[in-house]
Amino acid sequence: QQDREIDAGVHTWARKMAHQPVLTYITPPFEETTEITGHIKLKLWVSSETGDMDVFAKLHKLIDDEGRFFQLTEGSLKVSHRKLDDDLSTDYRPFHTHDAEQKLAKDEIVPIELEIWPTSMVFQPGERLVLELSPHNIQFYDGVYNSGTHHIYTGGETASYLQVPIIPAKK
C-alpha cells in the first residue's frame, strides 16, 4: 500500500484522465440553473470475457471548457453481487443482498443497478455533468487488477441510463 496525496480544490480533467481505463459520458451544457438533489441510480447492461467485473461510477461537475471539475459523488458494484432485494429496493435506490455470487458466463449480457451516493449540487448555465466509469478506483489504484475486456451496452433493449433527481426551479 502506498500513500496517496489528493490535491484540494478544482482539478483539470485532461490531467486526471491521462492513461486511465475510463469511459466518460458528458452532458450538453446546462441551459439554465439546475439543482440535482437526492439519490442517483445507474442502470447498466454489461458483459465480460471474464466471470466477473467491477464497476466504479463517479459523477463530476465540469465547470468550464478548460476541463476544470470537481467530484460530486460515487458508487461501485462487483457485478457478481448484482442480486437485488425486491422488497427493499426502490425505483431510485437499488438494495443488493450480497448473499449470492452470480458469476457471468463469457459474454453474457446482464442488467445491473448501481447506487450512486446521494448528493446535492446546483449547476449554472454552461456547466456539465460528467459520468465516469472505470474497472477500479482510479483515484487510489494505479494498476488494473480486474483484467479482461468488459462491455457496456447503450441502445435498444439494452439501453443503459443514469437516473438523476432534478429539483424543479422555484418560480
Q: Each predicted region: which residue ranges?
A:
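Intrinsically disordered, low-complexity Ser/Thr/Gly-rich stretches
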Residues: 1-171
